[in-house]
Amino acid sequence: MSKMNPNEKKENASKNENVNNEEATNLQEEQSNAADEAAGSDNVSGEVEALQKKYNELNDSHLRLMAEFDNYRKRTMREKADLIKTGGEGALKNLLPIIDDFERALQNVRAAEDVEAVKEGVDLIFGKFMGYLSQQGVKPIEAIGKPFDTEEFEAIATIPAPEPDMKGKVLDCVQTGYTLFDKVIRHAKVVVGE
């Protein structure tokens, strides 16, 4: 063995001490990192649990909303079918008194000797019926003397106009047309002058 001088010994001792200090520092850092990782994994697992809980809540809410919407859709379809089936019920109920009037008129026609009284009764029933239709928004289309318009009229015949200013105008109405709130529900069948 060679002898070391005292300065070399100090240097070696200093180097060994530095190495030992570095190893200790590295060991402390590794322990600190391991503790951080353990704490981090606890945080991650806590976050995963929280996210899983939130997912389950949202999924449950979504399923409930889907079921609620499906029930709503079925209910509205049922209500719509009922409305289509019985939608005219109110209008038909209001026609029943007019039908009763017609029945009474028919009973009186058979026994009546006064034709004028029967005619007057039928006129009253007709007026009552037309009044009801008017309340419902149904109105007759005025045709005679008006210029022919395909939106309101259906020409079933043309005849020579009796006067020159009647050309292209309605001369006669064979069947009355009707509107429902200004929408034509039946065109008037008319004779037009040419």
Curated annotation (Swiss-Prot):
Residues 24-34 have a biased composition (Polar residues). SUPFAM superfamilies: Coiled-coil domain of nucleotide exchange factor GrpE (SSF58014), Head domain of nucleotide exchange factor GrpE (SSF51064). Residues 1-48 are annotated as: Disordered. It is found in: Cytoplasm. GO terms for biological process: protein folding. Gene3D superfamilies: 3.90.20.20, Head domain of nucleotide exchange factor GrpE. GO terms for cellular component: cytoplasm. Keywords: Chaperone, Cytoplasm, Stress response. Coiled coil: none annotated. PANTHER family: GRPE PROTEIN, GRPE PROTEIN HOMOLOG, MITOCHONDRIAL. Participates actively in the response to hyperosmotic and heat shock by preventing the aggregation of stress-denatured proteins, in association with DnaK and GrpE. It is the nucleotide exchange factor for DnaK and may function as a thermosensor. Unfolded proteins bind initially to DnaJ; upon interaction with the DnaJ-bound protein, DnaK hydrolyzes its bound ATP, resulting in the formation of a stable complex. GrpE releases ADP from DnaK; ATP binding to DnaK triggers the release of the substrate protein, thus completing the reaction cycle. Belongs to the GrpE family. Homodimer. This is Protein GrpE.
